[in-house]
Swiss-Prot record:
Listed SMART domains: FN3, IG, IGc2
GO MF annotation terms: protein homodimerization activity
Ranges where the Fibronectin type-III domain occurs: 375-469, 503-598, 604-696, 702-797, 804-899
Residue runs in coiled coils: 120-149
Keyword list, A-Z: Coiled coil, Cytoplasm, Immunoglobulin domain, Repeat
Gene giving rise to this polypeptide: MYOM3
Annotated function: May link the intermediate filament cytoskeleton to the M-disk of the myofibrils in striated muscle.
Location (main, coarse): cytoplasm
GO BP annotation list: sarcomere organization
Subcellular location per the Swiss-Prot or TrEMBL entry: Cytoplasm, Myofibril, Sarcomere, M line
Protein name as it appears in the record: Myomesin-3
Ig-like C2-type domain ranges (all copies): 154-246, 269-361, 1120-1205, 1334-1423
Subunit field text: Homodimer.
Length: 1437
């Protein structure tokens, strides 16, 4: 690509003389061109024009001819090189045209043209004077031009031209300068002078060939993008020209209109995947999702497409396709087996669609009954008619070891959601006819597999089907008319009208199975529009009788499945049609039909082969089974050494190739394949050869990172990095090519592969620049060719500093650390290497930072304290006495992370007692080797260690462990694409532990799991037991008691369980004779152990007492006994409940309560639950004492005692106080006649166990003249007498009950104080009124009975201030005190006297007292009886 060139600087214009000459030459060329064209036109004319020019009238002298010749020579010499080039080009074109013309006529035409041109030239009219004047002017101009050109300042005939180039290519800037004398040339980059000596050798090359100036920039990098200027200067002046160079990163292989830049500018950015779809292992009935990330936003998200097995997927109720934030995802809310398959996502891109794919495997859901088979799949409805259809499905791949005996079919009508079992199909077939359906209704079906264990979960429901006459469409015809309109007519309209239908035809069996036959026939023709039904008849061959086939509903479709046929018999069938007018004649009988035998499953495929694919997958291929009944294949796998086959896929595979994902790297697997048909799953194929899961072998990728390690006069030492992808095999060697920059061809350095990555290249030319490239080779072949290296100058190194270290590599990469290793430089410089300087560069940074503050002496370094998740680049520089040398080639970016599944070195002791270090790498290629080193200083010493290598595992055994073996052991796995390495530092402390363990293994001791233990059994037996590790059947036990071996006896039983490692001694009745030491001596082969138990002194006495107590307790429990003894509980209502529970009772069992040895009838007992309950409503000191519950029957008795004295009683009262304190209500304020009362209600209060304290404004209050405090059983109060303003404020009541303290507060101020005072004043006034009010205090009875003729005297006491007015009432009427009635008042005593009472005096009397504060009436009823009539009241006395 080129950019518009830039002319010289604005201050350097061309000389005016040169511009004038250039215009003159251009004008002359144009005139000559017009003359040639005119001559050609004249020469081709048929007519020959003859005329005489004005020049023919003149005669030319010799001087004139000489002057014309000079003019011609001058003009020709003054032509520019561009005009000459155009003239030569025109001549070549004319010559080529002439060569293309052939034939005699063409030659004559050329002759005629030449003749006419000459004739025209000779006959041209010229003005002699004008010609002479022009010639003189030409000669004068040429002389002046020569004088100007002889000595002049520089100017650019051809300026620099801007360039845009790809990265790593070469650009050549050229220009032509004219000057006399030759100028001095200087090149600049962004106004900085270019000195090739200051740059890498061969970077810049500057040349000057007779005015042609050039600057060559090799291996362009992004940093070379700049403005380049060339300045020329001599004695007459100076000039400059500049051009821009743009270096672009290579983005694609195409160029021009197919280039990446053109596409990006035209179509937008390219969309690439930044993540990889991984295999998904979903489970039936559960959700799963797939997602992938893109490098750019997808402008049209709807253009992202998802496919399953090549079929386009769309969003639905169960499946959602989403796109957000550069992430496309497919989410399935409920997974079915039908969702299994190869999923592919396709995203459009300007350079063609980008695709990724992965496989989704769906495992069976958890069975409702363990061991039940998996669910069927692919349920489909075929041959749908008015009232019947054929249902098919695929059998499940996993029956869980139980053969399928049948299939249950469930039906759902419309969208009701109600599933009803409708049919059952035998287990040997996956096809079943469904009849009895309703025309016009829609149905869905699902299937369950049944085995002897149970039923599977249901399959996915079939698609919704609508029952109808699908032949009706065939009988309809569309007739177009009137520009696009159509009319639909039925052929039934053209048939003859019939009444009774004709018989059906072509009765035949469309399907014959083991359990049924599907009959089909053609409808009668003509059939008329009346709806038809059919009746069927069957006949056994040879019987001569016809039998009607019954059906639950009328047959409306020309299909019918016959289910009740007998095997080994042949049948013929015939059909009758029936409509509303009648029944047709029978059809012709069908051909003889018999049920088939049981369907056979398909044979397994042959030639099942397994091939390596990736680190976690294996590719399978097999020969196809050529059978039309084939539905697909099921694949099964198992690890080598196991017997159970695991299902790989649950949806039949249609092809003959499959990649099994999700396998464990390094493990060996076997595979088999089974054919699937409607008859079921066939037999398994032969198992494949065991295959280890590894990456398939491929050719390696290209080497890279070439570096110059040493250089002589005619030789170089080149190093490079290994391929990033080694192809799963060992690199056998490298092929190196070299290229001299001054030559065109590449030359091979070696014919045989170089085993190392360092090569010495000889026979080079000093001062030349060379570049190199290489290929790696493994067992798969020669890999990719690397890109050319940078140009290296072949110039002998003489600098005093050392050369670059090489082969800098990172290993043992973890989340925060890694280990760097490198090789020392090949060029030492002026002296030996004294150390190394290691620096690093963080991701995204251009600054190199030192790893350590000073140099290190070794060729390895552990770098720690790095940031997880970041990438780092490292480089190393060697140093000697002269200083730091050249830096090494930087490492590739190293990402710090803990890789999942990464292995570490295992340290332990084997079965023979040897200490070992082992490392396992399942992902290592087969050709890998385990390279062990100690302290990173090379191979291990074979005198001290022994190395054992197995498949994917290496083991280092220490022969004689000692202090010499301490250090850091590291291991690296070769030939792996990724870093597989680890290290372990063996310390002295760890070595001592391992040596101790080694001694134990070589001198084994039976491992003691549990020493001697003592248990007391239910009946009081004593069990002595100990547990050791599992022993062999040959193990021996010797039990020593008091230095004497004992054996089993009736009182002392000895048990020895070798399988469990259990030794036990059961002593029936422990006594003094069993006191002493028990020693168990165990021996199992070489292993021994001895365990001793001592039972003496207090230990034995305690054991003896416990055994006796246990024995007595066992005897107690032979009859009714207390399972739960007496215990107390305080309820929220402050009741005390005593409870206990009895067990082992019967109907005759008696329960009694006692208090202080006296039986209590108030106690309760529930025989059903065995619960006893005694409630104490209000506990007081009188309830203090001993409570006892007793249960008894003929088997024995038991009792339980609760002592409610002392601490137990205090605990109950404390609990009552706690509950009472918690029950306290918020403080209330109440006005009284004496003052203001503040109180709280409680459920219980006890002065001894509850303390109350009142506070006013946080100051404790004490009872006094104005402040009184008190409590009752249910209330705590504070009474303020004669309240004042100083009594306002916050009042707090603190209740303490044991450790429980509760505070209640209220604020006696503001409205609360005003309300209380108002109530106080009101009550006080009422009290005064009540005190002074007139009232009858006492004296009058309710009833007074008296005999006639007696005197009645009634006296009462009245009060009131002032003295009240007194009057008597009889039957609410005032009493007139005359004759026999008399009233007497003596102070507060009022008396009424009635003399000689009679029956008229009977009635209701009242004394009415009244003063200014109120009044009151005292009532009395007087009853007068006659002589001899004693009232009832007196009789009852």
């Amino acid at each position: 690509m080129t950019l518009p060139h830039s002319l010289g600087g604005a201050g350097d214009p061309r000389p005016p003389q040169a511009m004038e000459v250039h215009r003159l030459e251009h004008r002359q060329e144009e005139e000559q061109k017009e003359e040639r064209q005119h001559s050609l036109r004249m020469g081709s004319s048929v007519r020959r024009r003859t005329f005489r020019s004005s020049e023919e009238e003149h005669e030319f002298s010799a001087a004139d001819y000489a002057l014309a010749a000079a003019l011609a020579l001058t003009a020709s010499s003054e032509l520019s090189w561009e005009a000459q080039l155009r003239r030569q080009t025109s001549a070549v074109e004319l010559e080529e045209r002439g060569q293309k013309r052939v034939g005699f006529g063409n030659d004559w035409e050329r002759t005629e043209i030449a003749f006419l041109q000459t004739h025209r030239l000779l006959r041209q009219r010229r003005d002699w004077k004008t010609l002479r004047r022009r010639t003189e002017e030409k000669v004068q101009e040429a002389k002046e031009l020569r004088e100007l050109c002889y000595g002049r300042g520089p100017w650019f005939w051809i300026p620099l031209r801007s360039h845009a180039v790809w990265e790593h290519t070469t650009v050549l800037l050229t220009c032509t300068v004219q000057a006399s004398p030759p100028p001095q040339v200087t090149w600049y980059k962004n106004d900085t002078r270019i000195d090739p000596r200051l740059f890498r050798a061969g970077k810049y090359r500057i040349t000057n060939n007779y005015g042609l100036l050039s600057l060559e920039i090799r291996r362009c990098a992004i940093e070379d993008s700049a403005t380049y200027t060339v300045r020329v200067k001599n004695a007459h002046g100076q000039a400059s020209s500049f051009a821009k160079v743009l270096v672009r990163t290579y983005l694609g292989k195409d160029a021009g209109f197919d280039s990446e830049i053109f596409k990006r500018s035209t179509f937008g950015p390219s969309v690439e995947f930044t993540s990889v779809l991984k295999p998904v292992f979903a489970r039936e009935k559960e959700p799963f999702s797939l997602s992938c990330l893109f490098s750019e936003d997808v402008l049209d998200a709807e253009s992202i497409q998802w496919f399953r097995d090549g079929s386009l997927l769309r969003s639905s109720r169960r499946r959602k396709i989403l796109y957000t934030d550069r992430q496309a995802s497919l989410k399935v809310s409920c997974t079915y087996k039908e969702d299994e398959g190869l999923y592919m996502v396709r995203v459009p891109s300007p350079f063609g669609p980008r695709e990724q794919s992965t496989y989704v495997l769906v495992r069976d859901a958890e069975a409702e009954n363990p061991g039940a088979p998996g669910s069927p799949l692919n349920v489909r409805c075929l041959d749908v008619n008015r009232d019947c259809l054929i249902l098919t499905w695929a059998p499940p791949s996993d029956t869980r070891g139980n053969p399928i005996t049948a299939y249950t079919i469930e039906r759902c009508q419309g969208e009701s959601g109600e599933w009803i079992a409708c049919h059952e199909a035998p287990g040997g077939t996956c096809r079943c006819p469904i009849q009895g359906l309703v025309e016009g209704q829609s149905y869905r079906f699902r299937v369950r597999a049944i085995s002897r264990v149970g039923s599977s979960v249901p399959s996915k429901a079939s698609e919704l089907v609508v029952m109808g006459d699908h032949d009706a469409a065939r009988r309809k015809t569309e007739i177009p008319f009137d520009l696009g309109n159509k009319i639909t007519i039925s052929t039934d309209a053209f048939e003859d009208t019939v009444t009774i239908p004709s018989p059906p035809t072509n009765v035949h069996a469309s399907e014959i199975r083991e359990a049924y036959v599907v009959l089909a026939w053609e409808e009668p023709s003509p059939r008329d529009r009346a709806p038809l039904t059919y009746s069927l008849e069957k006949s056994v061959i040879g019987s001569g009788t016809w039998e009607a086939i019954s059906s639950e509903s009328p047959v409306r479709s020309p299909r019918f499945a016959v289910l009740d046929l007998e095997k080994k018999k042949s049948y013929v069938f015939r059909v009758r049609a029936m409509n509303q007018y009648g029944l047709s004649d029978p059809s012709e009988p069908s051909e003889p039909i018999a049920l088939r035998g049981p369907p056979a499953t398909l044979p397994p495929p042959a030639q099942v082969q397994a091939f390596r694919d990736t680190q976690t997958s294996v590719s399978l291929t097999w020969d196809p089974v050529k059978d039309p009944e084939l539905l697909g294949y099921y694949i099964y796998s198992r690890k080598v050494g196991t017997s159970e086959w695991q299902t790989v896929n649950n949806k039949p595979i249609q092809g003959t190739r499959f990649t099994v994902p999700g396998l464990r790297t390094g493990k060996e697997y076997e595979f088999c394949v089974r054919s699937v048909s409607e008859a079921g799953v066939g037999e398994s194929s032969a198992a494949t050869e065991p295959i280890r899961v590894k990456q398939a072998l491929a050719t390696p990728s290209a080497p890279y990172g070439f570096a110059l390690l040493n250089c002589g006069k005619n030789e170089m030492v080149i190093g490079w990095k290994p391929p990033k992808r080694r192809g799963g095999g060992k690199i056998l060697g490298y092929f190196l090519d070299q290229h001299d920059s001054e030559e065109l061809d590449w030359h091979a350095v070696n014919q045989q592969p170089i085993p190392t990555r360092v090569c010495k290249v000889s026979d080079l030319h000093e001062g030349h620049f060379y570049e190199f490239r290489a290929r790696a080779a493994n067992w798969a072949g020669v890999g990719e060719l690397s890109a050319p290296s940078s140009l290296f100058e072949c110039k002998e190194w003489t600098m005093p500093q050392p050369g670059p270290p090489y082969d800098v590599r990172a290993s043992e990469v973890r989340a925060t650390s890694l280990v760097l290793q490198w090789e020392p430089p090949l060029y030492m410089g002026a002296g030996p290497v004294t150390g190394y300087h290691v620096s690093f560069q963080e991701e995204g940074s251009e600054q190199w930072k030192p790893v350590t503050p000073g140099p290190i002496s070794g060729t390895h370094l552990r770098v720690s304290d790095l940031q997880p998740g970041k990438s780092y680049v490292f480089q190393v520089q060697a140093m000697n006495s002269a200083g730091l040398g050249q830096p090494s080639m930087p490492t590739d970016p190293v990402l710090l992370e803990d890789k999942p599944g990464a292995h570490e070195i295992e340290v332990g002791v084997d079965e023979e007692g040897f200490i070992y270090l082992a490392f396992e790498a399942p992902e290592a290629p087969d050709s890998s080797e385990f390279q062990w080193s100690k302290d990173y200083k090379g191979p291990l010493d074979p005198q001290r260690v022994k190395i054992e290598d197995k498949v994917n595992k290496s083991k280092v055994i220490l022969k004689e462990p000692g202090l010499e073996d301490l250090g850091t052991y590291s291991v690296i796995v070769t030939d792996a694409d990724e870093d597989i390495s680890a290290s372990h530092t063996l310390t002295e402390e760890e070595l001592e532990k391992l040596k101790k363990l080694s001694h134990e293994i070589r001198n084994p001791v039976i491992k003691l799991i549990s020493g001697w233990n003592i248990d007391i059994l239910e009946r009081g037996e004593v069990r002595l037991w100990l547990e050791v590790e599992k022993l062999s059947p040959a193990a021996e036990l010797h039990l020593i008691f008091n230095n004497k071996e004992i054996f089993s006896s009736p009182n002392r039983k000895i048990n020895f369980d070798r399988e469990k490692g259990l030794v036990e001694v059961i002593i029936q009745n422990l006594s003094e004779e069993d006191k002493g030491s028990y020693t168990a001596q165990l021996q199992d082969g070489k292993a021994k152990n001895q365990i001793t138990l001592t039972l003496v002194d207090d230990d034995f006495d305690k054991l003896l007492r416990k055994a006796d107590a246990k024995r007595r307790d066992w005897k107690r429990k032979q009859g009714p006994y207390f399972e739960r003894p007496l215990q107390w509980k305080v309820t929220e209502d402050c009741q005390v409940q005593l409870t206990c529970k009895v067990t082992n009772t019967k109907k005759e069992t008696r329960f009694q309560w006692f208090f202080q040895r006296a039986e209590m009838p108030d106690g309760q007992y529930d025989p059903e639950t065995g619960t006893g309950l005694l409630c104490i409503e209000e506990l007081s000191k009188k309830d203090k004492g001993i409570y006892r519950a007793m249960v008894s029957d003929d088997r024995g008795e038991d009792d339980t005692i609760l002592d409610l004295t002392g601490d137990a009683l205090d605990a109950i009262f404390t609990e009552l106080g706690r509950i009472g304190a918690l029950s306290a209500t918020p403080l209330k304020i109440q006005g009284t006649e004496e003052g203001i009362r503040i109180f709280s209600k409680v459920k219980y209060y006890n002065v001894e166990y509850m303390k109350t304290t009142w506070f006013h404004k946080d100051k404790r209050l004490e009872s006094g003249d104005r402040i009184r405090t008190g409590t009752t059983l249910d209330e705590i109060w504070l009474h303020i007498l004669d309240p004042k303003d100083s009594d306002k404020g916050k009042y707090t009541l603190e209740i303490a009950a044991g450790k429980e303290v509760r505070q209640l507060s209220t604020d006696l101020s503001g409205q609360a104080f005003e309300d209380a005072m108002a109530e106080h004043q009101r009550l006080k006034t009422l009290a005064i009124i009540e005190k002074n009010r007139a009232k009858v205090v006492r004296g009058l009875p309710d009833v007074a009975t008296i005999m006639e003729d007696k005197t009645l005297c009634l006296t009462c006491i009245v009060s009131g201030d002032p003295t009240p007015e007194i009057s008597w009432l009889k039957n609410d009427q005032p009493v007139t005190f005359l004759d026999r009635y008399r009233m007497e008042v003596r102070g507060t005593e009022v008396t009424i006297t009635i003399e000689k009472v009679n029956s008229e005096d009977s009635g209701r009397y009242g004394v009415f007292v009244k003063n200014k504060y109120g009044s009151e009436t005292g009532q009395v009823t007087i009853s007068v009886f006659k002589h001899g009539d004693e009232p009832k009241e007196l009789k009852s006395m």
